[in-house]
Swiss-Prot record:
Gene3D superfamilies: Nucleic acid-binding proteins, Recombination protein O, C-terminal domain, Recombination protein O, zinc-binding domain
Protein name per the record: DNA repair protein RecO
SUPFAM superfamilies, per the entry: ArfGap/RecO-like zinc finger (SSF57863), Nucleic acid-binding proteins (SSF50249)
Gene: recO
Keywords annotated in UniProt: DNA damage, DNA recombination, DNA repair
Amino acid sequence: MIIVSRAIVLHNTAYNDSYSIAHLFSRESGRVSYLIPRSSKRGKSGGSLRLLISPLNELEITAEHKQHRDLHFIKEAKLCSLHGRIQSDPVRNSIALFLAEFLYLILRLPEADTNLYDFVAFSIDKLEEMDGPMANFHLAFLFRLLVPLGLIPDLQFGGSVIPRWFDPADGRFVPNAPAHGRGIPPHQSTYLQLFRRITFDNMKAFRLSRAERRQVLDYLVDYYRFHLPPFPLLKTPDILSTLFD
Protein backbone atom coordinates (compact mmCIF):
# COMPACT_ATOMS: atom_id res chain seq x y z
CA MET A 1 0.00 0.00 0.00
CA ILE A 2 1.29 3.45 -0.92
CA ILE A 3 0.70 6.19 1.65
CA VAL A 4 1.33 9.92 1.40
CA SER A 5 1.71 11.74 4.69
CA ARG A 6 3.50 14.40 6.64
CA ALA A 7 5.91 12.87 9.13
CA ILE A 8 8.29 14.10 11.83
CA VAL A 9 11.70 12.50 12.29
CA LEU A 10 12.21 11.24 15.84
CA HIS A 11 15.31 9.07 15.76
CA ASN A 12 17.71 7.26 13.46
CA THR A 13 19.61 4.11 14.46
CA ALA A 14 22.13 1.85 12.75
CA TYR A 15 20.69 -1.40 11.38
CA ASN A 16 23.28 -3.07 9.15
CA ASP A 17 25.98 -2.16 6.63
CA SER A 18 23.40 -1.08 4.08
CA TYR A 19 20.61 0.56 6.05
CA SER A 20 19.74 2.54 9.13
CA ILE A 21 16.28 2.63 10.69
CA ALA A 22 14.49 5.97 10.86
CA HIS A 23 11.65 6.23 13.36
CA LEU A 24 9.06 8.75 12.21
CA PHE A 25 5.79 10.01 13.67
CA SER A 26 3.41 10.37 10.74
CA ARG A 27 0.12 12.20 10.64
CA GLU A 28 -1.65 9.37 8.83
CA SER A 29 -0.12 6.29 10.48
CA GLY A 30 1.38 7.25 13.84
CA ARG A 31 4.80 5.83 14.70
CA VAL A 32 6.40 4.08 11.71
CA SER A 33 9.91 2.75 11.09
CA TYR A 34 11.64 3.00 7.71
CA LEU A 35 14.80 1.54 6.23
CA ILE A 36 17.10 4.33 5.06
CA PRO A 37 20.06 3.61 2.71
CA ARG A 38 23.33 4.38 4.48
CA SER A 39 25.28 4.95 1.28
CA SER A 40 24.65 7.14 -1.74
CA LYS A 41 25.87 4.18 -3.80
CA ARG A 42 22.35 2.82 -3.52
CA GLY A 43 21.15 5.68 -5.68
CA LYS A 44 20.77 9.42 -5.71
CA SER A 45 17.40 9.25 -3.96
CA GLY A 46 18.90 7.21 -1.13
CA GLY A 47 21.62 9.77 -0.54
CA SER A 48 19.14 12.66 -0.58
CA LEU A 49 16.83 10.86 1.82
CA ARG A 50 19.64 10.24 4.27
CA LEU A 51 20.31 13.98 4.46
CA LEU A 52 16.68 14.67 5.39
CA ILE A 53 16.65 12.28 8.36
CA SER A 54 17.48 14.75 11.11
CA PRO A 55 15.64 15.04 14.47
CA LEU A 56 12.39 17.02 14.23
CA ASN A 57 12.60 17.58 10.50
CA GLU A 58 9.05 17.53 9.16
CA LEU A 59 8.82 15.72 5.84
CA GLU A 60 6.19 14.99 3.26
CA ILE A 61 6.73 11.35 2.39
CA THR A 62 5.44 8.86 -0.12
CA ALA A 63 6.04 5.43 1.37
CA GLU A 64 5.31 1.79 0.70
CA HIS A 65 3.71 -0.01 3.64
CA LYS A 66 3.36 -3.78 3.53
CA GLN A 67 1.16 -5.75 5.89
CA HIS A 68 2.77 -7.76 8.68
CA ARG A 69 6.07 -5.88 8.35
CA ASP A 70 7.66 -3.64 10.93
CA LEU A 71 10.10 -1.94 8.54
CA HIS A 72 8.98 -0.08 5.44
CA PHE A 73 10.51 1.94 2.61
CA ILE A 74 10.20 5.62 1.72
CA LYS A 75 9.88 6.13 -2.03
CA GLU A 76 9.99 9.94 -2.01
CA ALA A 77 10.51 12.63 0.62
CA LYS A 78 10.84 16.38 0.82
CA LEU A 79 11.03 18.94 3.61
CA CYS A 80 7.73 20.57 4.55
CA SER A 81 9.62 23.61 5.80
CA LEU A 82 13.22 24.58 6.40
CA HIS A 83 14.17 24.82 10.08
CA GLY A 84 17.46 26.59 9.62
CA ARG A 85 17.56 28.18 13.07
CA ILE A 86 16.95 24.86 14.80
CA GLN A 87 19.84 23.35 12.89
CA SER A 88 22.29 26.22 13.35
CA ASP A 89 21.51 27.68 16.78
CA PRO A 90 23.03 25.61 19.63
CA VAL A 91 20.21 26.42 22.08
CA ARG A 92 17.39 25.59 19.67
CA ASN A 93 19.23 22.49 18.51
CA SER A 94 19.69 21.24 22.08
CA ILE A 95 16.00 21.78 22.81
CA ALA A 96 15.13 19.95 19.58
CA LEU A 97 17.29 16.98 20.56
CA PHE A 98 15.50 16.80 23.92
CA LEU A 99 12.06 16.97 22.30
CA ALA A 100 13.01 14.33 19.74
CA GLU A 101 14.34 11.96 22.41
CA PHE A 102 11.27 12.48 24.58
CA LEU A 103 8.83 11.94 21.71
CA TYR A 104 10.76 8.89 20.55
CA LEU A 105 10.20 7.32 23.97
CA ILE A 106 6.49 8.10 24.35
CA LEU A 107 5.10 7.86 20.80
CA ARG A 108 5.04 4.12 20.27
CA LEU A 109 1.82 3.16 18.52
CA PRO A 110 1.27 2.86 14.75
CA GLU A 111 -2.02 4.71 15.04
CA ALA A 112 -2.98 8.08 13.61
CA ASP A 113 -3.59 10.91 16.09
CA THR A 114 -3.97 14.09 14.08
CA ASN A 115 -4.49 16.37 17.10
CA LEU A 116 -1.28 15.12 18.68
CA TYR A 117 0.61 15.38 15.40
CA ASP A 118 -0.61 18.92 14.76
CA PHE A 119 0.47 20.03 18.25
CA VAL A 120 3.96 18.59 17.79
CA ALA A 121 4.31 20.17 14.34
CA PHE A 122 3.07 23.52 15.69
CA SER A 123 5.59 23.33 18.54
CA ILE A 124 8.48 22.69 16.15
CA ASP A 125 7.49 25.72 14.09
CA LYS A 126 7.35 27.79 17.29
CA LEU A 127 10.84 26.64 18.24
CA GLU A 128 12.08 27.76 14.84
CA GLU A 129 10.29 31.11 14.74
CA MET A 130 10.39 32.45 18.31
CA ASP A 131 12.77 35.18 19.40
CA GLY A 132 13.97 35.98 22.88
CA PRO A 133 14.68 33.72 25.88
CA MET A 134 14.08 30.02 25.24
CA ALA A 135 14.90 28.62 28.69
CA ASN A 136 11.35 27.46 29.46
CA PHE A 137 10.43 26.15 26.01
CA HIS A 138 10.80 22.46 26.89
CA LEU A 139 8.74 22.94 30.06
CA ALA A 140 5.93 24.67 28.16
CA PHE A 141 6.03 21.87 25.60
CA LEU A 142 5.77 19.10 28.20
CA PHE A 143 2.88 20.80 30.01
CA ARG A 144 0.95 21.51 26.80
CA LEU A 145 1.62 18.00 25.45
CA LEU A 146 -0.43 16.56 28.32
CA VAL A 147 -3.59 17.87 26.63
CA PRO A 148 -3.53 15.89 23.34
CA LEU A 149 -2.21 12.86 25.24
CA GLY A 150 -5.20 12.96 27.59
CA LEU A 151 -2.98 13.01 30.68
CA ILE A 152 -4.04 16.30 32.26
CA PRO A 153 -3.60 16.15 36.05
CA ASP A 154 -6.06 17.62 38.52
CA LEU A 155 -4.19 20.67 39.78
CA GLN A 156 -6.99 22.09 41.91
CA PHE A 157 -6.61 22.23 45.69
CA GLY A 158 -10.35 21.73 46.10
CA GLY A 159 -10.69 24.78 48.32
CA SER A 160 -8.22 23.52 50.89
CA VAL A 161 -5.75 25.99 52.37
CA ILE A 162 -3.68 23.20 53.92
CA PRO A 163 -0.42 22.55 52.03
CA ARG A 164 -0.71 19.33 50.06
CA TRP A 165 1.52 16.82 48.37
CA PHE A 166 1.07 16.08 44.67
CA ASP A 167 0.81 12.40 43.80
CA PRO A 168 2.04 11.90 40.20
CA ALA A 169 0.63 8.38 40.10
CA ASP A 170 -2.95 9.58 40.71
CA GLY A 171 -2.42 12.99 39.10
CA ARG A 172 -3.89 14.95 42.03
CA PHE A 173 -3.10 16.65 45.30
CA VAL A 174 -3.25 14.51 48.44
CA PRO A 175 -2.95 15.36 52.15
CA ASN A 176 0.01 13.09 52.88
CA ALA A 177 3.17 11.83 51.20
CA PRO A 178 2.32 9.01 48.73
CA ALA A 179 3.48 5.53 49.73
CA HIS A 180 5.47 5.08 46.50
CA GLY A 181 7.92 7.74 47.70
CA ARG A 182 7.89 9.88 44.55
CA GLY A 183 5.39 12.53 45.54
CA ILE A 184 6.06 16.24 45.14
CA PRO A 185 6.28 17.91 48.58
CA PRO A 186 4.03 20.87 49.44
CA HIS A 187 6.77 23.50 49.22
CA GLN A 188 7.48 22.46 45.62
CA SER A 189 4.03 21.40 44.43
CA THR A 190 3.26 25.10 43.95
CA TYR A 191 5.35 24.84 40.76
CA LEU A 192 2.53 22.81 39.25
CA GLN A 193 -0.10 25.38 40.19
CA LEU A 194 2.06 28.05 38.57
CA PHE A 195 3.00 26.14 35.46
CA ARG A 196 -0.47 24.92 34.57
CA ARG A 197 -0.88 28.35 32.91
CA ILE A 198 2.32 28.25 30.88
CA THR A 199 2.19 28.59 27.09
CA PHE A 200 4.76 29.32 24.40
CA ASP A 201 3.55 32.92 24.38
CA ASN A 202 3.87 33.63 28.11
CA MET A 203 6.73 31.30 29.08
CA LYS A 204 9.22 34.18 29.28
CA ALA A 205 7.37 35.52 32.33
CA PHE A 206 8.18 32.39 34.36
CA ARG A 207 11.48 33.20 36.03
CA LEU A 208 13.36 30.23 37.46
CA SER A 209 16.90 29.49 38.47
CA ARG A 210 18.76 26.69 36.73
CA ALA A 211 18.16 24.40 39.73
CA GLU A 212 14.43 25.22 39.88
CA ARG A 213 14.02 24.65 36.15
CA ARG A 214 15.70 21.26 36.38
CA GLN A 215 13.51 20.34 39.36
CA VAL A 216 10.34 21.16 37.43
CA LEU A 217 11.61 19.15 34.47
CA ASP A 218 12.39 16.15 36.68
CA TYR A 219 8.92 16.27 38.22
CA LEU A 220 7.30 16.50 34.79
CA VAL A 221 9.29 13.61 33.37
CA ASP A 222 8.45 11.52 36.43
CA TYR A 223 4.75 12.23 35.88
CA TYR A 224 5.06 10.95 32.32
CA ARG A 225 7.03 7.98 33.62
CA PHE A 226 4.10 6.95 35.83
CA HIS A 227 1.54 7.23 33.06
CA LEU A 228 3.46 6.02 30.00
CA PRO A 229 5.60 3.07 31.16
CA PRO A 230 8.10 1.74 30.36
CA PHE A 231 10.05 5.00 30.37
CA PRO A 232 13.86 4.73 30.43
CA LEU A 233 16.21 7.47 31.55
CA LEU A 234 16.61 10.44 29.23
CA LYS A 235 20.08 11.47 28.08
CA THR A 236 19.42 15.03 26.94
CA PRO A 237 18.20 16.88 30.10
CA ASP A 238 21.78 17.20 31.35
CA ILE A 239 22.63 19.11 28.17
CA LEU A 240 19.72 21.50 28.70
CA SER A 241 20.78 22.11 32.30
CA THR A 242 24.11 23.52 31.14
CA LEU A 243 22.53 26.03 28.75
CA PHE A 244 20.29 28.17 30.90
CA ASP A 245 20.92 30.25 34.03
